[in-house]
Amino acid sequence: KKNNIIEIITHKKLYQFLILFRRATLVALLFLSKDYLFAESFKVRALWIVRDFMTTQDKIDEVVSFAENNNYNHLFVQIRGRGDAYYDSKLVPRSHLLNNSNFDPLEYILNQTRGTHIRVHAWLNTYYLWSSPQKPSQNDHLLLQHSDWLDTKVPDEMNVSHMLDKMEKDRKINGEGFYLAPTHPEVEAHLQNIITELLQNYRLGGIHFDYIRYHDIGWGMNPTGLKFFLNYTNGMPGLPVIKIQEKPSFSDFK
């Protein structure tokens, strides 16, 4: 029993430390010198390249040519759209829009800009996983393989087929579609592995994280994530879900 009490206290202290650390980091960023923050602002001319322009060599050549001719020096190229990859990956299924199985769009654009003034950044839709009412064509897509990783408004198992059927009838039913749950530990580990793989295999100018958020207000109730929160806060026995959502500690956790 004594060990259990010590473990609970340790968890609470760790949880409190993480919250304080995040707040302190934000405050520190706000007080950084504006001269430091904006010293390079006029030297950066950037383009965001959506994944539709990353599907063939011809399209990429057009992008690079436009950037060079108009003095753009940073390209944020979208290589993760809806839980898929526009690069060679052992972790993420290849986009169905890439017809040539031997073509690596990210490697190609890096090669085409080598020796130029252009830096290529990887642009990822981080938690946004799927938006179509139709199932992904890739059998190894996370929507089909790990429905338990999806975010939800209520702490119940996500029925993907049922949600897709409802979206087919009314696109407003599920909003933007499906998101991964930021509160799920395995989701965080998976995303970290994706970033590690990119950094190990490609010489990138940087990584641009898009959709690094929840689906909307009221989301964040993935069952596994909720259990993780309750363990760190010593639980809230018998407390209705709606009351847990109102707790400031739950907002901090999210």
Question: Model regions: which residues?
Answer:
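Catalytic domains of carbohydrate-active enzymes, especially glycoside hydrolases
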Residues: K59-D84, Y202
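Hydrophobic faces of well-ordered beta-strands that scaffold small-molecule active sites
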Residues: R45-I49, L75-V77, V120-A122, I207-F209
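Boundary at the C-terminal end of the N-terminal hydrophobic targeting segment
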Residues: L37-S41
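Aromatic-lined substrate-binding rim segments of carbohydrate-active enzymes
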Residues: G83-N125
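Conserved, mostly hydrophobic/aromatic
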Residues: L75, T113, L191, L198, ...
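Acidic-and-aromatic substrate-binding clefts and catalytic sites of carbohydrate-active enzymes
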Residues: V50-K59, R80-A85, N99-N100, Y128-L129
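Active-site-proximal loop/short-helix segments
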Residues: W130, P136-Q138, K169, R203-K254
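Active-site-adjacent "subsite" loops/lids of carbohydrate-active enzymes
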Residues: F42-A46, M54, Y127-E197, N201
